[in-house]
Amino acid sequence: MNITPKIGVLATLLFVNANLFAQETPFKLGVRLGGGMSVTTGLDKILVPEDYYSNYNFKDKWQFTPTVSVFAQYHVDGSIIGVEGGFSYWQKASQLVYNDDKELNYKVTPRYNYIGVSALLKIYPWRKGFNISIGGRAGANLNGKGISYESNQEDNKFANYHFATVAETERLMKEKLTGQPDIAVGGGFGYEIGNHWALDLRYYHGLNSTIKTERNDYNWAEHSTHGQNIELSISYLFKL
């Protein structure tokens, strides 16, 4: 019995199988950890909507924020186009600092947590490695009352003004200035290192207001407040 043809067929099948397994799968799952800076502008126009007085100034300060994502990526090896989508946790934060010529100062710090979805189109100019991403994300606000307040308004030199306590002012802000869901467009640059690691630098700009002003008796007005996030992250990707 001639077994040579059978051995040849078996060897061919093994060779084809080895080639199939060696091919790079276009689907990958990834875990991303990162941090960045965030700011929300327009809060000053909520608190002081008109020129009631002068000799004061506001300043918006960026705040550190974390981000975590679980995502899926599709990119055929050698292709210019890829896509990415997943679930993310992120924060939007900012700090508004007030000072005036009476030496009154306060800090208002909104910090909101979000869980949502993201989708990005990725362009690989050199077909691998470096990529440009364009897309957006949308998420639910987990802590709509996530605003804090600090001030020296309880100092004796302001006794004649009969200011509310710091605790009461913060309570009112939590009640009347509520955090909203986040819908943002964004994009950035990334670089994939080998088969498993990736670095990304991305920017997101909020399309809707971060804070909604509820009806109140404190002259706080409704005004658009758009958040911005800059995030640097590292990812680990798993082949499927």
Feature names for model-found ranges:
Residues 1-9:
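Bacterial N-terminal signal peptides that target proteins for export
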Residues 18-22:
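Sec/Tat signal peptide C-region and signal peptidase I cleavage site
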Residues 23-75, 154, 167, 237-240:
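Short glycine/proline- and aromatic-enriched beta-strand/turn motifs that initiate or cap beta-hairpins
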Residues 25-27, 62-66, 111-115, 179-185, ...:
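Residues that define the transmembrane beta-barrel architecture of outer-membrane proteins
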Residues 31-37, 66-74, 87-89, 117-123, ...:
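Residues on the lipid-exposed face of transmembrane beta-strands in outer-membrane beta-barrel proteins
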Residues 43-59, 92-112, 142-178, 210-224:
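Flexible, solvent-exposed loop segments that connect beta-strands
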Residues 79-83, 129-130, 195-201, 240:
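Repeated loop/turn-to-beta-strand initiation elements of outer-membrane beta-barrel proteins
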Residues 226-240:
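Outer-membrane beta-barrel "beta-signal"
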